[in-house]
Amino acid sequence: MLEVEAPLEIVQESSRKLLGLTNLSEITKPLIEAEKPNLNSLCLLNHKEILSHIIPGSPGSLNFKKVETLNFQMVKEFPLLSEYPLLKQKDIGIDTAGVLLKQLMVNKSSCYRDGISTISVPAHMPMHPMVNPSKGSSGLLITKLTLLLPPMFRQGILLLKKLSLLGFRLVRFCLKAIMLKAQEGLLLIVDQVHVLNHVDPIIVH
């Protein structure tokens, strides 16, 4: 027997009739639908099924209170992603000079009509009268000295009475130390008065 090859169109017609299809697009339609998932069907998926794939463990061990809160967050956040395109999110940090100028011009109280920005200063500043610090400080120093010297002399006299009972040499040594300390204190006071009043130095003998 001679084998005769049938044309390709006849073979396709016969295969479509056997499968019950009348158009070639009906054969490829299921394949295209399988390759391109429907977004609406993905959105309509049950959130419990999605979380069962994301969260490890069996679906029966899930805490349904957490599932409900997560579902609320997904419902609240998902529409926002579709409203803002990705281009607006990429514009962060490009050039903010225009935004800063707009913010400056909004504050009309600190800008003239020509656009020059000014610093707002309070109209009435509290003005204190000029006081000479040297006179005030020197007067305070004198009053302090007049208040401190009498009790110091009293303590020195009592100390001399106590030292006189111990011996002459010890009294002499203590008096010498006291005089040196007093001379040092007087020199420090003279330096302070000279700095404050700008007078000639006082020579202490």
UniProtKB/Swiss-Prot annotation:
Main location per the UniProt record: virion
Subcellular location per the Swiss-Prot or TrEMBL entry: Virion
Domain of life, source organism: Viruses
Pfam families the UniProt entry points to: Corona_I
Keyword terms of this UniProt record: Virion
InterPro entries: Corona_nucI (IPR004876), N2-like_embe-CoV (IPR044311)
Cellular component per GO, a single term: virion component
Transmembrane feature ranges: none
Function noted in UniProt: Structural protein that is not essential for the viral replication either in tissue culture or in its natural host.
UniProt family annotation: Belongs to the coronavirus I protein family.
Name the UniProt record assigns to this protein: Protein I
Native source organism of the sequence: Human coronavirus HKU1 (isolate N1)
